[in-house]
Amino acid sequence: MPTPKAFALLGPTAGGKTALALKIAETLPVEIISLDSALVYTGMDIGTAKPSASERAFVPHHLIDIITPVQTYSAARFVEDCTRLVGEISSRGRFALIVGGTMMYFRALTQGLNDLPEADACLRADLDEQKQMYGLDFLYRTLQQVDPETACRLKPNDSQRIGRALEVYYLTGKPMSTHLGSPTSHTLPFDLHTAALIPENRARLHENIALRFHLMLEQGFIGEVENLRRLYPSLTADSPAIRCVGYRQAWEYLDGKTDFPAFVEKGIAATRQLAKRQLTWLRKTPLDCVTDPFSDGNSCTRLIEAAKRFFGA
């Protein structure tokens, strides 16, 4: 049996990935595997710019709406799910198209996973209790002592990642920075061609981000977050689902911690920061094909042709 193949289409948020993926689907018999950690959640449609029902009816999409916002999803599970799906799609005589911008997942897929321990509910509860008693700053200072390298790259208010770094240290006796620095041996079980949309005009990308955020508001984003609060009372601002860009800012607005103009400003700024981080990852990622979606009028045609050549179609 021939080795399965997958074509990855990467890029920053609001960079045109979805539109291009649908163009490819008009030409080739593809199925889309979402590379987006926010799209896995049900009930989070507007703020994640989730593909519409008509778009999902036009071409099969995978790894969308697979868990509730109170459940968790991981890079390890993505690697497992994506690898399985590439094989299944290939067995149907169709082509796997991996589309998105969650670069941590893509790195895990292509470079392997570090040997980090699973989350420990008892230890996490103990850390949460310490945070309630002494404050997040206490946990951050503790992390600075046991793992200064990780503490240096985390923001002092990043509760989830500070807690996870301390959890790893207490479970293994080694700082997370040591684990992440350990080499991993990894071989993909399928052939992969990696293409990326990298816009050089940052102002144009920022404009797209602002326009899309305002469109989300018009579509009822605040109502969507209010519905999440009603359906899932256990959700908090620190829940992984609510840490998705835009949702954290909307949550704070609904908590009365900010006014509406400040919420909008913070939401747009956070989305721009996400795009900046994605572009930083992309520039460090080995790529087979790169195009600028804003300045290259033939980017769509060139990527479709690259996909055809790769799949032998």
Swiss-Prot record:
Monomer. It holds the Pfam family IPPT. Its EC number is 2.5.1.75. This is tRNA dimethylallyltransferase. PANTHER family: TRNA DIMETHYLALLYLTRANSFERASE (PTHR11088:SF60). Catalyzes the transfer of a dimethylallyl group onto the adenine at position 37 in tRNAs that read codons beginning with uridine, leading to the formation of N6-(dimethylallyl)adenosine (i(6)A). InterPro entries: Dimethylallyltransferase (IPR039657), IPT (IPR018022), P-loop_NTPase (IPR027417). The keyword Transferase applies. One of its GO terms (biological process) is tRNA modification. Substrate binds at T13, A14, G15, G16, K17, T18. ATP binds at G11, P12, T13, A14, G15, G16, K17, T18. Belongs to the IPP transferase family. One of its GO terms (molecular function) is ATP binding.
